[in-house]
């Protein structure tokens, strides 16, 4: 009898812990709001190489953008530039954009290989881009917070291990992307630690 009660308590404890963990994950995932392509009036993409993302790679866009600036206009400009005759890309180069104010925007389809403008092959990479030049300005708190949640969201949603997290410069010798101020958070392990906390 005591044995039966003991094991019943163990089962109840496990269920409680699982529900608690699930509730925690659902709570922060509700904070991840992705603005769709339709809201920044994206042009239709050109059919391109397909892939399955198996790692997460972070970039910065590399030109000045303040919290008060128009992120939608910037993203639309990136698409026009990338799909122009000089590059002939299929779409914007990244799968997601994060503005300085923390808003997250949908980029190209995650099933489509991204672009990097450098020598590394982005096949298999899910690309998240922080708008702005993070070699020149500190990462805004809202942008950093959204980046951490977005990495965790992508890890959980697309079943990509967070341990694969890296940056553009980790794959290319031709760039300082994602900028020294953002890269500091990767070097000291802060971003990966915070992502891990969300996923636990």
Per-region residue spans from a language model:
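Bacterial N-terminal signal peptides that target proteins for export
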Residues: 1-8
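Short coil/turn segments at secondary-structure boundaries
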Residues: 3, 66-69, 138
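Bacterial N-terminal signal peptides
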Residues: 8-16
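Basic/polar, cationic surfaces and motifs that engage anionic cell-wall
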Residues: 19-61, 100-116, 121-200
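Secreted/periplasmic proteins that engage bacterial cell-wall peptidoglycan
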Residues: 49-110
